[in-house]
Protein backbone atom coordinates (compact mmCIF):
# COMPACT_ATOMS: atom_id res chain seq x y z
CA UNK A 1 0.00 0.00 0.00
CA UNK A 2 1.34 3.41 -0.98
CA UNK A 3 1.43 5.87 1.94
CA UNK A 4 2.29 8.83 -0.28
CA UNK A 5 -0.24 11.62 0.03
CA UNK A 6 -1.43 13.54 -2.97
CA UNK A 7 -0.82 17.24 -3.39
CA UNK A 8 -3.19 19.45 -1.41
CA UNK A 9 -6.27 20.87 -3.04
CA UNK A 10 -6.57 24.66 -2.82
CA UNK A 11 -10.03 26.20 -2.57
CA UNK A 12 -10.39 29.99 -2.83
CA UNK A 13 -13.44 31.55 -1.19
CA UNK A 14 -14.41 35.11 -2.01
CA UNK A 15 -15.09 37.54 0.80
CA UNK A 16 -18.55 38.27 -0.64
CA UNK A 17 -19.29 34.54 -0.82
CA UNK A 18 -18.63 34.23 2.89
CA UNK A 19 -21.29 36.83 3.69
CA UNK A 20 -24.18 35.68 1.55
CA UNK A 21 -26.73 38.24 0.41
CA UNK A 22 -26.27 42.01 0.46
CA UNK A 23 -25.62 43.43 3.95
CA UNK A 24 -25.72 44.68 6.56
CA UNK A 25 -24.47 41.36 7.88
CA UNK A 26 -24.82 40.01 11.36
CA UNK A 27 -22.39 37.68 13.09
CA UNK A 28 -25.05 34.94 13.06
CA UNK A 29 -25.56 35.32 9.30
CA UNK A 30 -21.82 35.06 8.68
CA UNK A 31 -21.61 31.95 10.85
CA UNK A 32 -24.52 30.33 8.98
CA UNK A 33 -22.83 30.92 5.62
CA UNK A 34 -19.50 29.59 6.90
CA UNK A 35 -21.23 26.54 8.43
CA UNK A 36 -22.90 25.75 5.09
CA UNK A 37 -19.54 26.19 3.34
CA UNK A 38 -17.88 23.75 5.75
CA UNK A 39 -20.69 21.23 5.21
CA UNK A 40 -20.18 21.42 1.44
CA UNK A 41 -16.42 21.07 1.74
CA UNK A 42 -16.74 18.09 4.07
CA UNK A 43 -19.17 16.37 1.71
CA UNK A 44 -17.03 17.11 -1.36
CA UNK A 45 -13.62 16.01 -0.08
CA UNK A 46 -12.82 12.85 1.83
CA UNK A 47 -11.10 12.92 5.22
CA UNK A 48 -7.74 12.00 3.66
CA UNK A 49 -7.65 15.03 1.36
CA UNK A 50 -5.25 17.78 2.36
CA UNK A 51 -7.27 20.93 1.84
CA UNK A 52 -5.94 24.50 1.84
CA UNK A 53 -8.56 27.23 2.07
CA UNK A 54 -7.78 30.78 1.10
CA UNK A 55 -10.28 33.60 1.27
CA UNK A 56 -10.97 37.19 0.46
CA UNK A 57 -12.01 39.73 3.07
CA UNK A 58 -12.82 43.00 1.29
CA UNK A 59 -16.39 43.36 2.56
CA UNK A 60 -15.39 42.28 6.06
CA UNK A 61 -12.64 44.92 6.18
CA UNK A 62 -15.16 47.44 4.89
CA UNK A 63 -17.55 46.55 7.70
CA UNK A 64 -14.81 47.21 10.25
CA UNK A 65 -13.98 50.52 8.59
CA UNK A 66 -17.64 51.58 8.81
CA UNK A 67 -17.77 50.51 12.47
CA UNK A 68 -14.64 52.51 13.22
CA UNK A 69 -15.98 55.64 11.55
CA UNK A 70 -19.21 55.31 13.55
CA UNK A 71 -17.30 55.17 16.85
CA UNK A 72 -16.15 58.77 17.17
CA UNK A 73 -14.55 58.32 20.60
CA UNK A 74 -12.45 55.28 19.68
CA UNK A 75 -9.11 55.74 17.89
CA UNK A 76 -9.16 54.13 14.46
CA UNK A 77 -6.87 51.25 13.58
CA UNK A 78 -4.79 51.13 10.42
CA UNK A 79 -5.94 49.18 7.37
CA UNK A 80 -3.28 46.49 7.81
CA UNK A 81 -4.53 45.76 11.34
CA UNK A 82 -8.14 45.59 10.11
CA UNK A 83 -7.08 43.15 7.39
CA UNK A 84 -5.38 40.96 10.01
CA UNK A 85 -8.45 41.14 12.25
CA UNK A 86 -10.74 39.98 9.47
CA UNK A 87 -8.32 37.24 8.40
CA UNK A 88 -8.36 35.93 11.96
CA UNK A 89 -12.14 36.29 12.23
CA UNK A 90 -12.82 34.39 9.02
CA UNK A 91 -10.16 31.81 9.84
CA UNK A 92 -11.65 31.27 13.29
CA UNK A 93 -15.16 30.78 11.89
CA UNK A 94 -13.94 28.41 9.16
CA UNK A 95 -11.77 26.45 11.57
CA UNK A 96 -14.60 26.06 14.06
CA UNK A 97 -17.07 25.00 11.35
CA UNK A 98 -14.63 22.50 9.83
CA UNK A 99 -13.81 21.11 13.28
CA UNK A 100 -17.54 20.58 13.81
CA UNK A 101 -17.86 18.78 10.46
CA UNK A 102 -14.68 16.71 10.78
CA UNK A 103 -13.56 16.52 14.43
CA UNK A 104 -10.76 14.09 13.51
CA UNK A 105 -9.19 16.45 10.96
CA UNK A 106 -6.30 18.75 11.82
CA UNK A 107 -7.41 22.31 11.08
CA UNK A 108 -5.44 25.51 11.65
CA UNK A 109 -5.76 29.19 10.88
CA UNK A 110 -2.85 31.20 9.50
CA UNK A 111 -2.83 35.00 9.37
CA UNK A 112 -0.60 36.26 6.57
CA UNK A 113 1.23 39.43 5.64
CA UNK A 114 2.00 40.80 2.20
CA UNK A 115 4.94 43.06 1.51
CA UNK A 116 4.18 45.76 -1.03
CA UNK A 117 6.25 48.49 -2.61
CA UNK A 118 4.88 51.80 -1.30
CA UNK A 119 6.05 53.43 -4.54
CA UNK A 120 4.12 51.02 -6.76
CA UNK A 121 2.27 53.14 -9.37
CA UNK A 122 -0.80 50.93 -8.91
CA UNK A 123 -1.53 52.90 -5.73
CA UNK A 124 -2.30 55.88 -7.98
CA UNK A 125 -5.16 53.99 -9.65
CA UNK A 126 -6.68 51.65 -7.10
CA UNK A 127 -8.96 49.00 -8.57
CA UNK A 128 -9.88 46.86 -5.54
CA UNK A 129 -12.76 48.30 -3.53
CA UNK A 130 -12.95 47.80 0.22
CA UNK A 131 -16.30 47.98 1.94
CA UNK A 132 -19.88 48.50 0.86
CA UNK A 133 -21.09 50.10 -2.36
CA UNK A 134 -23.41 53.07 -2.00
CA UNK A 135 -26.01 54.02 -4.60
CA UNK A 136 -25.97 57.71 -3.65
CA UNK A 137 -23.72 60.15 -1.83
Which residues fall in each region the model found?
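N-terminal glycine-/serine-/threonine-rich phosphate-binding loop
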Residues: 1-54, 63-65, 69
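Flexible, active-site-adjacent loop/turn segments at secondary-structure boundaries
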Residues: 16-17, 59, 79-80
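Ligand-binding beta-strand-loop-alpha-helix segment within the catalytic cores
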Residues: 70-137
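Short glycine-enriched loops at secondary-structure junctions
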Residues: 57-60, 113-115
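Internal catalytic or translocation cores that form aromatic/hydrophobic pockets or channels
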Residues: 60-61, 100
Amino acid sequence: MDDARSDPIVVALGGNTLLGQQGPWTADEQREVVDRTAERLASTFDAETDLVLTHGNGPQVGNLLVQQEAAEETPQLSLDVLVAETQAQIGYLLQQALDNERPQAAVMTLVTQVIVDPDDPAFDRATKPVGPFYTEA
